[in-house]
């Protein structure tokens, strides 16, 4: 199982966003942008098409759940989260609880995770998907919630030695009013069969990364 409750992350960015960037209009057009985009667009590289039998074999390998999917399936169930959120570096954490219900879908290929909880007296709900792409050898996660209208996508790998995955991506900072994106890093650790930890890192007011959130998950009996 894994999952950040991104509504916490979004709220933290509202407090800690770096506001020393100047605002720009959404309608601003830089001359030559369209021309540059056209000239820098990558063209598909030609390749030799394999025979039909090889194509079917390759596709079968790509679509068949493997060890990573079995690991994801072991995280199925209901989990209680003890949430600590830091609005600013060095500040006292705000505490709350959350609930996550995980299950595998589409023949054990993806994890679907539904989250509920409260933050600052307001109810929230979120939904995550987690995939392991057999071709790219990469975990891909998506997140939507009732605190926004976008979809967050994070990607990263699994480290067997530390039993953890590190996922990175970007999130819109809605407080900026400029669609400014900020970098997000998530570290998800397996403690044992019934305990997991998720840590979320993002930029503080000085632009330096700090831990914004930590969720300690315990599997419900």
Q: What is the meaning of each model-derived region?
A:
Residues 19-26:
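Bacterial lipoprotein signal-peptidase II cleavage site
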